[in-house]
């Protein structure tokens, strides 16, 4: 997993509450478990005016010009600004895969669905929860300013707005350490490879009958 330390990135405002995982990545794209290649189908039913299918070339598909990610001013955004209950609905790890594959590293909203929230950390995304008034102000500034950017520093747990105001945010210490070091579940396990190997060798010596071919 790619470590996350800090980011100075463009913001895209998705001004919708209760965005569910089927909107983030529709069900027909869940057949693959490669963890990559989902970016072109992120928010597929909102970004395009036709019906998307797996393996389809999205370059020439008809786009919805009103959708935020199709607007030139938000091109290359790495921070997604959201509303309440983002990531609700069915549990699918493909949702954070699609967001990360598109290029997002940070999500900022007033609340996130629990399973989605935890899946973000496991896949290199930083979901940040802020009070609703702070979210409202970020939406106002973002929509009023072309190329609106925020600086997010995980080590200090701060967001710096273009006007210089600093906003503090909370993050679980364990999740923070994992993101800073790029540790996913596999990486965490491999950190204890020597202890696991020692345990397995002792178990084989103590209980050889478990390992009869």
UniProtKB/Swiss-Prot annotation:
Catalytic function, reaction form: (2R,3S)-3-isopropylmalate = (2S)-2-isopropylmalate
Amino-acid biosynthesis is among the record's keywords: yes
A GO term for molecular function: 3-isopropylmalate dehydratase activity
Keyword Ribonucleoprotein set for record: no
GO cellular component, as recorded: 3-isopropylmalate dehydratase complex
InterPro entries the UniProt entry points to: 3-IsopropMal_deHydase_ssu, Aconitase/3IPM_dehydase_swvl, AconitaseA/IPMdHydase_ssu_swvl, IPMI_Swivel, LeuD
UniProt-listed Enzyme Commission number(s): 4.2.1.33
Major enzyme class: lyase
Protein family according to the UniProt entry: Belongs to the LeuD family. LeuD type 1 subfamily.
Main function: Catalyzes the isomerization between 2-isopropylmalate and 3-isopropylmalate, via the formation of 2-isopropylmaleate.
PANTHER family: 3-ISOPROPYLMALATE DEHYDRATASE SMALL SUBUNIT, 3-ISOPROPYLMALATE DEHYDRATASE SMALL SUBUNIT 2-RELATED-RELATED
Official protein name in the record: 3-isopropylmalate dehydratase small subunit
Native species: Aromatoleum aromaticum (strain DSM 19018 / LMG 30748 / EbN1)
């Amino acid at each position: 997993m790619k470590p996350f330390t800090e980011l100075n990135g463009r913001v895209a405002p998705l001004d919708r509450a209760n965005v569910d995982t089927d909107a983030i990545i529709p069900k027909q794209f869940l057949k693959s478990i490669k963890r990559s290649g989902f970016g072109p189908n992120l928010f597929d039913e909102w970004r395009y005016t036709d019906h998307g299918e797996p393996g389809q070339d999205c370059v020439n598909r008809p786009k919805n010009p009103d959708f935020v990610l199709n607007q030139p001013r938000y091109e290359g955004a790495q921070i997604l600004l959201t509303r309440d209950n983002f990531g609700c609905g069915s549990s699918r790890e493909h949702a954070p895969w699609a967001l990360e594959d598109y290029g997002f590293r940070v999500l900022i909203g007033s609340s996130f669905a629990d399973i989605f929230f935890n899946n973000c950390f496991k896949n290199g995304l930083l979901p940040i929860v802020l009070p609703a008034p702070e979210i409202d102000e970020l939406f106002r500034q973002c929509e009023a300013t072309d190329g609106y950017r925020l600086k997010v520093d995980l080590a200090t747990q701060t967001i710096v707005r273009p006007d210089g105001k600093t906003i503090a945010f909370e993050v679980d210490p364990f999740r923070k350490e994992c993101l800073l070091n790029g540790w996913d579940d596999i990486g965490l396990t491999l950190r204890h490879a020597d202890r696991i190997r020692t345990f397995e060798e002792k178990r084989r010596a103590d209980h050889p009958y478990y390992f009869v071919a």
